Structures are given as structure tokens and as C-alpha cells.
């Protein structure tokens, strides 16, 4: 009679195994969920400064900031370091507007023609009194 009693015990043990498997699966899914949350928290964490000056492969890829700075060469430093030149006064621009377009562009042929016509008119006029 011992044999029938042992059979139900082994059958109870077989029922316990699937439940233990499901509990292991639950633990595994919880671990994956925790890892996913940790990855997301790392993704949205602000970039921190790294004092490592090494450019080896391990140091270039150990954090997102080093990957951007060392691996890709992208540096998001302050842009306020550039100094602008002082604004020029408008006194220089007014004489340029007084000049004709031909002198600003470098076309001096019109000036030569004007000088020749002025020279011929001066030579043709004998003067007022002499």
C-alpha cells in the first residue's frame, strides 16, 4: 500500500514545478523591467563632466559625454568665448555713398572720358581778359 501513497506525492511535486517556473519567469520579467527603468533613467540623466583625458577605445565609449567629446569630436562648450568686433561708426559709410557707382566698382573709363572732355573745353576757352 505504500506505492499508491507515493504516487500522489510525486504528482504533487510535479504540480509544484510549473508554479516554480512561473515564479522564476515573473522574477526574470521584473528584473528586465528594472533594467529598462534603469536604462531610461540613465538616458534622461544630465551629462556629467569627466576628468579622464585618455583617448583609448575604452575611455571614449565609457559614457555618453566622452563618446560625444572624444569619439565624435562634438563639444558643447559655452559659445560666449567668441568676442565680437566693435561696431563701426557710420561716418565711413557716408562718403562711400557720395561716390559714384563707377568709382566704387573700379570702372575708371568714365572718369578718363570726363577728364578728356574737361581738358578740351579748357584749352578751347582763351580766358576772360588777356
UniProtKB/Swiss-Prot annotation:
Q: Which residues carry this modification: Phosphothreonine?
A: 89
Record localization:
Host nucleus, Host nucleolus
Q: List the disulfide bonds.
A: none
Question: Which Gene3D superfamilies does this entry report, sorted A to Z?
Answer: Tat domain (4.10.20.10)
List of residues that carry Phosphoserine: 94
UniProt GO cellular component terms: host cell nucleolus
Residue ranges for the region (Cysteine-rich) are 50-66
Changes after translation:
The phosphorylation by CDK9 does not seem to be important for transactivation function.
Which segments show compositional bias classed as Basic residues?
79-91
Q: Does the keyword DNA repair apply?
A: no
**GO molecular function ontology, one term from the record:** RNA binding
One GO biological process this protein is involved in is: positive regulation of viral transcription
Feature: compositional bias, Polar residues: 11-29, 92-109
Q: What is its main location?
A: host cell
Where is the segment annotated Core? 67-77
Annotated motif Nuclear localization signal, and RNA-binding (TAR): location in the chain? 78-90
- What's noted about domains in the record? The Arg-rich RNA-binding region binds the TAR RNA. This region also mediates the nuclear localization.
Quaternary structure, from the entry: Interacts with host CCNT1. Associates with the P-TEFb complex composed at least of Tat, P-TEFb (CDK9 and CCNT1), TAR RNA, RNA Pol II. Interacts with CCNT2; the resulting complex is unable to bind to TAR RNA.
- Family the UniProt entry places it in: Belongs to the lentiviruses Tat family.
Its recorded name reads Protein Tat
Q: Which organism is it from?
A: Human immunodeficiency virus type 2 subtype A (isolate SBLISY)
Taxonomic lineage of the native organism? Viruses, Riboviria, Pararnavirae, Artverviricota, Revtraviricetes
